[in-house]
Amino acid sequence: MEFARRARRLYPDREAVVDGDLRFTYAEFLERCDRWSSALQDLGVGQGDRVAYIAPNTHSHLEAYYAVPQIGAVLVPVNYRLLPDDFEYIINHCGAKVVCAHPDYIEAIDGIRGKLEGVEHFVALEGSGDDWIDYEAALATHSPDYKEIEIAETDLLTINYTS
């Protein structure tokens, strides 16, 4: 994570992320990551907890690659091309506490929601739905001051499933 902090310090106004019409500088992008870390901690996510993501390559998905591990949680990117039964298996097998989904996959997750044993929170990465946390609203209402924790180089960072 130090390389990201260094980039923010040295190049805060340099463009870092382009997602369609959205553009973020290093400072903007990493502040969003920090806000998401803070929001996750407020949801009770801590060291070793799994956060599953079902999304194509978007800025919010990229933010997860910084926000989740910097609080010691484990990122579980799920191949969005899979079927709902596969989503169910992966989410349950990894023990996800939070599921974050792009709007294209919310209906699929809602269809298996009752079978997702340990999931405590569902986050809509764009917009919101019934019983879904609005990602952008969570960023807007949280400080970038997350609680920093000690992370060892042997700590689990991500769980990747192959198809």
What is each PLM-predicted segment?
Residues 1-16:
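A short N-terminal helical cap/helix-turn-helix that marks the beginning
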Residues 82-111, 141:
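Conserved ATP-dependent adenylate/AMP-binding module captured primarily in the ANL superfamily
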Residues 106-154:
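ANL superfamily adenylate-forming
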